[in-house]
């Protein structure tokens, strides 16, 4: 179901209106409390600037970390307000609490185009419980609602779902709209051939996604630590590589399902092994049927890279979720980097390349190729759930188009 978005609202609709905007500002900090990556803050700028330009009074709501429903001084949004103020080139007022007299006073003092950042909503346990009274208090600060926090859209919380019952209009922000357009579009109406590259260490965390993708894709390429569960299910020796013993039957079923549907399910043909889980471990590259005892696979090998590149060459849409190996160790990053480079090249030839959140995003950024991709998702769990075909509560709650 298509949703109304900020694009549908004019300056006349928004001028002098108090607009509550749920954003995803859950950014990483270093030990000194400085932001180490402001990507999520920058991702919300198009929505915030659009509202400022249309004369709205912008009230931002966000969570930070997991304070478990109580005030945690290390999880205040102070560094976020400072960085946002620098990026916008204007003052951002932060409240002491997300509801209550201080928030009300600061919101009441706003002029058109002003920006207020409410303190961490998760300082209240009612946020994650989606408590109606708490949602009503948040909503009482505003006249309209915009959800731009795709990364939190899979949660039915007070600030993502509850507030929509009290605010009309409730619409998607520009980032949310773009996420839905790309991710939903790739699943519902992709340019074909459609390929998915699924990596990461565990089959268990990607079961739903793998099952859904085998239903939708023409090709599914699997890398990362989860490949060893598939190999063991085939009866191969995997040394001391990571295996989920309770998922061996499932691995067999997934391979059988792909075969029955005529979907090309590709696993690596060679792997880079290490004698220890360490950056400077001894390494060797072997065929998957020649993994010796005492060694563990930490990356896909050069033959597998060629196999995957050939399979992707004619694809018109590619979704990538999860690295091919332990890319944090330079010695075992070749597979992941090769996929990143391949997708960047495909983008240049008109292929729609979607990096579906999580570690793949970090890998693409580490390789300096983020700008070359069609779309980089800001959601981890939300991206996975959308690709699985699940309804995201934060999206479902918005006004229908």
Curated annotation (Swiss-Prot):
InterPro entries: Phosphoglycerate_kinase, Phosphoglycerate_kinase_CS, Phosphoglycerate_kinase_N, Phosphoglycerate_kinase_sf
EC number: 2.7.2.3
Superkingdom: Bacteria
CDD domains registered for this protein in UniProt: Phosphoglycerate_kinase
BP-aspect Gene Ontology terms: gluconeogenesis; glycolytic process
Catalysis: reaction(s): (2R)-3-phosphoglycerate + ATP = (2R)-3-phospho-glyceroyl phosphate + ADP
Protein name, per record: Phosphoglycerate kinase
Species: Prochlorococcus marinus (strain MIT 9313)
Organism ancestry: Bacteria, Bacillati, Cyanobacteriota, Cyanophyceae, Synechococcales
Gene for this chain: pgk
